[in-house]
């Protein structure tokens, strides 16, 4: 099975940086994707051990994120709930054309490799 996603959009909530007990870092950010038709959709993104710039993402920043889709379950208020999110493996400001091209090429390579 293949689980590859690429999202291009605008940061709609400032990045939240979390220091994990293991010493790692986690950034949570929401990216809003606007289609030419239909309503905008907001995608939650979690990025483990991201580059330093990811923790400074502000509302309005245009980004490209590649990774995988994950649905996780947790208990809140005594009720089991779930959240579907993108777990980022790579990301870049949209303005960095070279980085964006590398991210897209890597995603294409993964998809082509799965087709072989």
For every predicted segment, state its role.
Residues 1-116:
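Single-stranded nucleic acid-binding surfaces, predominantly the OB-fold ssDNA-binding core
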């Amino acid at each position: 099975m293949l689980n590859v996603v690429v999202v291009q959009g605008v940061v709609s909530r400032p990045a939240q940086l979390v220091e994990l007990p293991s010493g790692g870092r986690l950034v949570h950010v929401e990216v809003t994707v606007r289609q030419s038709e239909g309503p905008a959709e907001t995608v939650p993104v979690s990025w483990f051990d991201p580059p330093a710039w990811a923790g400074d993402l502000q509302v309005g920043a245009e980004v490209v994120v590649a990774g995988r889709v994950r649905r996780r379950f947790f208990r809140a208020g005594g009720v089991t709930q779930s959240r579907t999110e993108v777990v980022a493996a790579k990301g870049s400001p949209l303005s960095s054309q070279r980085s964006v091209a590398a991210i897209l090429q890597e995603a294409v390579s993964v998809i082509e490799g799965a087709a072989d």
